[in-house]
Amino acid sequence: MTLQEEIQNGESRTLEYKASLPYDSQKWIKTIVAFANGAGGKFVLGVNNQREFVGLAKSVDLFEIKDNIADTIGQMCEPQIMFDITAEMVDNAQLLIVNVFPGNATPYYIKSLGKENGTFIRLGATTRNADWTALEELSNRGRHVYYDEFACPSVKVEDEDIKYLCRDFSERAERKITRKDLENLNIIIGNEKDTATNAYAIL
């Protein structure tokens, strides 16, 4: 799908556009943060709310606005967000596209607001503050911790269950699976390696 087709379909979880760059940086930087916390996205300048390609004003210095955007993202956001900025002509209108890549060090946030108040996510075509649930999920993702690795202390680790899992996994893997392998897979965790995880409970 071309950029023109994307814009004609309207704003989305991965697309937002403005006729010009808002004077208040926070009005657009939170969208950059939200894109980095999600699937990435494009922030396009030169398109109005009616999806018309009005282009940037001829008086705008493209190099200057690119530098301004890059500096603002670098100074206002934490951790460092990966992005690129390109210029494109569509229907004789000069557009500027900030392509934000999905980050793997979530949560990304506006430094001046702090992590709790400065973390944003995309909900449909809107940018919203991340609530505590979303913030926790982003934090876990940034630490590369997933649901099946969470401790599940309500489930007791039984020797018979360990033997069954080792036997079942050995048949599937066509090699001997030991208790140590289950520990390495975070199926059981803890200082004494005797705490079940959600993966253990599910299996």
Q: Could you describe each region identified by the protein language model?
A:
Residues 1-203:
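Conserved N-terminal catalytic/coupling substructures associated with nucleotide/phosphate chemistry
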